[in-house]
Amino acid sequence: CSSLLLNDKLFNLVLNKVLQKKKYAFSKLQNMEKVVIGRTDRADFPALGIADIDIKIDTGAYTSSIHCNHIREEENVLLCTFLDPKHPEYNGKEMRFESYDITAVKSSNGEIQYRYVVQSNIRLFQKVYKISLTLSSREDMRFPVLIGRKFLTKKFIVDTELTDVSHAQKAL
């Protein structure tokens, strides 16, 4: 009988600890100002001269990526052209980045690619945020921009039933 009481006390102790942690997590979540975003949207990249471009929100991806081509390094400067001539937002303008990095990105099939990373900004919900973008060829993809968890964390909650939430607010 005493072992049953001990087990009950232990169970209640563990249960109280779990509930305290859940209450803490819930109160932390309530204090965060997160915006609901859908699975796809349209965004502006002011520093890159790109407006109203289709983006896909991908919580499975850690990094964010943008379609670009003609990527090359010349005398410690990264040069590239965003999008491609088939894309309606293509302007053919060559962009120069004196500050950039290289990172390893693991694809969904486990393959590792090394990509250039540049810092830029993105406008969503009429607010401008800093964003790290890896440069990749996404010409075979429906969305030229993929937004990953690194950018979404602590700013957005993704509702997969919604689309174009930010763009709809921009149109108002």
Describe each model-derived feature in a short phrase.
Residues 4-6:
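General secretory precursor processing signal
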Residues 16, 21-24:
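Polybasic, lysine-rich low-complexity intrinsically disordered segments
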Residues 29-172:
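Pepsin/retropepsin-fold aspartyl endopeptidases
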